[in-house]
């Protein structure tokens, strides 16, 4: 009898610990804007040392996060014909496929493809980019008719991620019926939902968040305030944007985090880096397991031509975002210090856990 009990206890001790899977109380998420590491079109403009130093100052922050997300502005491919012509101002971005390992080494887990450069080299360029990201285990979404959304598991939590753009080949954020359908599906199937969008007018004079829709180059670039609130009203927990090539306001709405634009992050060539366009914020936030914003940090970085983001001890990106947030979203449920600390102004005590 004793031997039977002993054998039973040994067997129980070796059972898989499925029932005791730890669910994290908090989640750390790192968010950045546009990434275009270099291009071979129309001429070769690539960083020194094969790009190994591009993310030097950002790696530790990106790697320590539970999730690191950004926007891949362009393609990863080694050939093909530009869909925008061959002129010097075509602005088609073709990064060598070998550079994909730099993204994995930097710590990225997810990259949006829903932007106006994903189709620079047509369907072949999109397929090559997807193949490269797949080879590194980096998730992606945002192209219509391809990957609509992804789910990443971290610490017992299922995190759903989707991305929207303003071009015809992307999942369009101006189609709120589409946005609502995708977000609703993720809310039902996952524990926490992150939405990425590429939108808004571009340039140094477009850093303020307007009311209503934005038009740029004759194209509807979306009503981004409405879009972000719509996503959160439908159950999303984190919404982050890019597209204007400058940083914009940060808001906490109904306890959920919104970054309206994180500007340029790693764009050493063919993108203006003058003045505020050179600010490269890396935003690190913490949420609870329900997706509610707890706090965070804007890590101020800056770019110069030919190099990636470098830490900026003057905290210029944080101070720019602080000023924009106070002007454009004064009712935000978060405050930003001059050195970039993000602090929630509301407590969730008493809410159902």
Predicted ranges, named:
Residues 4-13:
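Sec-dependent N-terminal signal peptides
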Residues 19-353:
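Acidic, metal/ion-coordinating pockets
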Residues 13-19:
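C-terminal segment of classical bacterial N-terminal signal peptides
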């Amino acid at each position: 009898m004793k031997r039977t009990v002993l054998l039973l206890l040994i067997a129980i001790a070796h059972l898989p610990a499925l029932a005791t899977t730890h669910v994290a109380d908090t989640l750390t998420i790192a968010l950045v804007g546009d990434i275009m590491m270099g291009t071979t079109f129309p001429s070769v403009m690539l960083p020194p040392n094969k790009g190994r130093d591009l993310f030097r100052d950002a790696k530790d922050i990106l790697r320590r996060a539970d999730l690191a997300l950004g926007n891949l502005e362009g393609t990863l491919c080694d050939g093909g014909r530009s869909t925008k012509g061959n002129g010097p101002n075509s602005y088609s971005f073709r990064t060598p496929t070998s550079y994909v390992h730099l993204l994995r080494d930097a710590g990225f887990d997810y990259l949006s493809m829903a932007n106006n450069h994903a189709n620079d080299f047509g369907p072949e360029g999109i397929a090559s980019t997807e193949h490269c990201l797949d080879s590194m285990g980096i998730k992606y979404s945002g192209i219509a008719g391809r990957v609509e959304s992804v789910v990443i598991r971290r610490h017992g939590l299922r995190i759903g991620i989707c991305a929207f753009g303003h071009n015809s080949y992307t999942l369009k954020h101006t189609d709120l019926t589409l946005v609502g359908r995708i977000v609703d599906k993720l809310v039902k199937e996952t524990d926490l939902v992150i939405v990425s969008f590429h939108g808004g007018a571009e340039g140094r004079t477009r850093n303020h968040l307007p009311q209503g829709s934005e038009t740029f180059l004759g194209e509807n670039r979306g009503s981004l305030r409405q879009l972000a609130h719509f996503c959160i009203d439908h159950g999303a927990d984190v919404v982050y944007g890019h597209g204007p090539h400058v940083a914009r306001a940060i808001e906490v709405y109904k306890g959920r985090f919104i970054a309206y634009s994180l500007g340029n992050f790693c764009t050493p060539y063919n993108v203006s880096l003058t003045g505020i366009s050179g600010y490269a914020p890396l935003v690190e936030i913490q949420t609870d397991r329900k997706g509610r914003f707890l706090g965070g940090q804007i890590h101020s970085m800056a770019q110069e031509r030919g190099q990636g983001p470098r830490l900026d001890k003057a905290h210029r990106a944080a101070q720019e975002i602080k000023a924009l947030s106070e002007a454009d979203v004064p009712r935000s449920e978060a405050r930003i210090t001059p050195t970039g600390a993000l602090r929630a102004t509301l407590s969730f005590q008493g809410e159902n856990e």
